[in-house]
Amino acid sequence: QAPTAGSVDLAGILLKTAAYGLMRFALPLFPNASAEFAPIAMWLGVFAIAYGAFLSFAQTDIKRLVAYSSVSHMGFVLIAIYSGSHIALQGAVVQMMAHGLSAAALFILCGQLYERLHTRDMREMGGIWARLPWLPAVSLFFAAAALGLPGTGNFVGEFLILIGSFPAAPWVVVLAACGLVLGSVYSLAMIHRAYFGPAKSEAPLQAMKARELYMVLGLAVLLILLGVYPQPVLDTSAASMHGVQQWFSGALTQLASVR
């Protein structure tokens, strides 16, 4: 029920605060406790992916669907944090940045859609693709980007997370990858229900204003730039994530030797 600005703040910044706290404080300050908790945390990540996906399936409110999909995608970050892999940790950093951009854009587009239709109920939408230039196409791009469209930052982040976490927990990664399939289903269903099908109303709809279009296109450019050239982000986070990985890997090795 939050306004669009509050939803963008939640998706782009506040949702990442917990992950930042885990990487910055929980793992370095409590490596042994984190190592004990790691298997549980990784399975909780899988649960978050599946739970968020199934809740997204059940939604008729488009904004609530985007919110639950954000919960699902953050499950990948939780898996990466407790994998003990440097590659996965760097993937988590990229994923948090990319998800912040894509989720923020989707919330902005939901707000723009609400301003024109005065409803967020997808059952009252449909038949909009040909009547609203730009907005449906941009929504489709960001929905695909959130799934990990190659060429976007989400693809780089999720790929690094899955590749880095696989040696530590193969079954967790396999199930998490299946969650991407669920994500594709509910995202494409959202686009189909909101923009395609028979029109529920023939009332004229206002096209996107230049300010609205430039705002989301700017986010799209940043997302593509992060996907095509993520090296500056990886270089910037390399030293910090290496330190976190060293502390956590040492605790994991010690725990394995004791057992």
Regions found by a protein language model. Give the residues of each.
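Hydrophobic transmembrane alpha-helices and their helix-loop junctions in integral membrane proteins
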Residues: 1-190
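Cytoplasmic/organellar membrane-interface segments at the starts of transmembrane helices
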Residues: 2, 132-134, 187-259
